[in-house]
Every structure is written in structure tokens, then in C-alpha cells.
């Protein structure tokens, strides 16, 4: 699908999880600035409703959308998609793209403690920094913009 690749036995691990892919889709519907019901957005974007509610709750908690309950309720976009990066969305979804556990800040590595350093860590950390930079360089507006 849009950015999501299926994890299969012997396959690849996606950088963008299904939940983040669904979040991008829901934001696509909300990008018109109008108020939409969660059910309407879910149906329009082919996102299963239970996922849509869970995702919209996370997006609301992160301040990206406003969710109003009740008869006149619904959800609408609060975030400026021109200033919200893919990295920001992944963080809002509680995800981070990590090459290795050793690139997680504060990770305790017994190898590095025993040997005083690790060239593998140095290389992975440099690659991780570039990957984070790339995720931060692409806004949701850019990703959602119609091409052609």
C-alpha cells in the first residue's frame, strides 16, 4: 500500500508500520480542513474503523488533530502539514525508526563497556542520523501532494 510493506517470513521489516500508514491516510482526508466523523474518514481511506479510532486518539494526544465527541462531533486537522514531517508523525504514533537497539539513546551496550568503543555502533549511529534527517526532511504535505 502507500508506504507500507508487508512483513512476511524471510521478507522485509517495514520502516512505516501499518498504523502510521493508516494515520497518513486519515490525515489525507482531514487535510481539506473540514470536520469529518471518524467513521467517514475511515471509510473514505479504507482504514478499519477500530484502527481509525485508535489512531485518531493518538493524533489528538499529539495535538495533530482535534477530536470532538457527541452528535455534532468529529475530527479535524490542527497541524500544519507543511511543517509536520514524517518523523514527527512517527513520533506521534509512538514509533521510531531504529536500525539497531544500539542506536537508541541511553542503550547500555556490554561490548562498548568492555572494549571502550565499537566501530559497528559508530557506523550504525551515522547511518541512523542520516535516516532521521531524511524522515525529518519530508513533510506530510509533500507526501500527500498529488503528483502529475
Give the location of each predicted region.
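Residue cluster at the C-terminal edge of the helix-turn-helix DNA-binding motif
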Residues: 61-64, 92
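Short, intrinsically disordered or compositionally biased N-terminal tails of bacterial proteins
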Residues: 1-14
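Beta-hairpin "wing" of winged helix-turn-helix
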Residues: 63-78
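Non-DNA-binding regulatory cores of transcription-related proteins
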Residues: 78-148
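Short, hydrophobic-biased segments on the C-terminal half of alpha helices
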Residues: 27, 56-57
Amino acid at each position: 500500500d502507500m508506504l507500507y510493506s508487508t512483513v512476511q517470513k524471510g521478507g522485509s521489516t517495514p520502516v512505516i508500520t501499518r498504523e502510521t500508514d493508516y494515520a497518513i491516510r486519515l490525515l489525507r482526508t482531514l487535510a481539506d480542513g473540514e470536520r469529518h466523523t471518524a467513521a467517514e474518514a475511515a471509510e473514505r481511506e479504507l482504514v478499519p474503523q477500530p484502527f481509525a479510532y485508535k489512531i485518531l486518539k493518538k493524533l489528538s494526544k499529539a495535538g495533530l488533530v482535534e477530536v470532538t465527541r457527541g452528535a455534532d462531533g468529529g475530527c479535524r486537522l490542527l497541524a500544519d502539514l507543511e511543517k509536520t514531517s514524517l518523523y514527527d508523525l512517527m513520533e506521534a504514533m509512538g514509533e521510531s525508526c531504529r536500525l539497531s537497539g544500539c542506536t537508541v539513546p541511553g542503550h547500555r551496550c556490554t561490548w562498548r563497556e568492555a572494549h571502550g568503543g565499537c566501530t559497528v555502533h559508530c557506523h550504525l549511529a551515522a547511518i541512523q542520523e542520516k535516516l532521521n534527517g531524511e524522515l525529518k526532511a519530508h513533510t506530510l504535505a509533500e507526501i500527500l501532494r498529488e503528483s502529475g
